[in-house]
């Protein structure tokens, strides 16, 4: 029997252990998609308690606390930080089998040197020790990033953002690149009641009057170039439902005018507007050699009462099951026909889409850029041992796992970087297993190079930050 969360955690063969120790463990990190705050990084934010560092904003934890019967007061409510931590400690033993159980203990080990199991009996001692350490040196946001050997962070930013803290970080002595990620979801959601207000913010940020669809595209382009000048090389689109509908420039202009004036926009018109605007952005991203990310098939804010009382991103989302194959293929093809398909990373929240994406990406590789179209790492509800291995196996079966750009945190927490370790251990177990079973040669130079590529070097070459 293996020790709980011991040195060989998730490593199920001698080859896996060797690959991890010699090739994966000490590789740097490129976190090319996350939700960390550039302001908090710049200010080297510190944390008053482990609750603030661990539970504030973490809807992954909130979901299973509710499932464990914890009242909302101890999750997002006005309970003290100590009460909230003890509520989490009560939940953790019930979470065996959930990745949060592993991540919780991995983070306790790596950040705080705590190897005890977190439960109601150990909660008081762990509360005391973690808080003492957090008050000392070396636990600010920048410190945690540096300790994790992170080289690049890409945040998630609205096109109207001034990127003030990205610029301040660039001018500082902080050695990690903190770069903006262009997330124009509000600019594509033309049926939203807030669309017109967002266009006004785009006007203000760009310094351009927006009164027509063409002037809207011009303002978007100005913000893309602003992000580019600030070091941005990635965009991100939350496409909860993948859509595609051809339209003319004239019809897109009509739809834009309706949305800007607050008129009702039908779903069919929304599809046309999104398609036309995405096609335009594809060309712009391709020109600037950006990587475009699509996060597909999330079903958001499913609980109306909770959305009304707590708002979005509070743990009431789930997996969608919309069909993606035809609209996704048509959108990629429409860009490719114009030679305007940028580097693209595709993620779906629905694991039933794994083989759809894994097979589709190789229909659009260009024979020049290795892995130009990527099947993105297991995302959100799939960010588990099984989910990661399923994604990696689908990619291996359909394409080149060796060209995979690997892991990202997609996190709001500065303590989440051990998730890269979790991922890397699974990569080594998968590849090591192939060698152990005679499916790959026992060539450590070859296998080690593949491991290093997936952990770091492929992303370094792909993004060229």
UniProtKB/Swiss-Prot annotation:
Protein family per UniProt: Belongs to the metallo-dependent hydrolases superfamily. Uronate isomerase family.
Protein name, entry field: Uronate isomerase
The organism's taxonomic lineage, starting at the top: Bacteria, Bacillati, Bacillota, Bacilli, Bacillales
Molecular function in Gene Ontology: glucuronate isomerase activity
Pfam family, one: UxaC
One GO term of the biological process aspect: D-glucuronate catabolic process
Pathway(s) annotated for this protein in UniProt: Carbohydrate metabolism; pentose and glucuronate interconversion
E.C. designation(s): 5.3.1.12
Keywords from the UniProt entry: Isomerase
Name of the gene encoding the protein in the UniProt record: uxaC
Cited PANTHER family: URONATE ISOMERASE
Reaction(s) this enzyme catalyzes, per UniProt: D-glucuronate = D-fructuronate; aldehydo-D-galacturonate = keto-D-tagaturonate
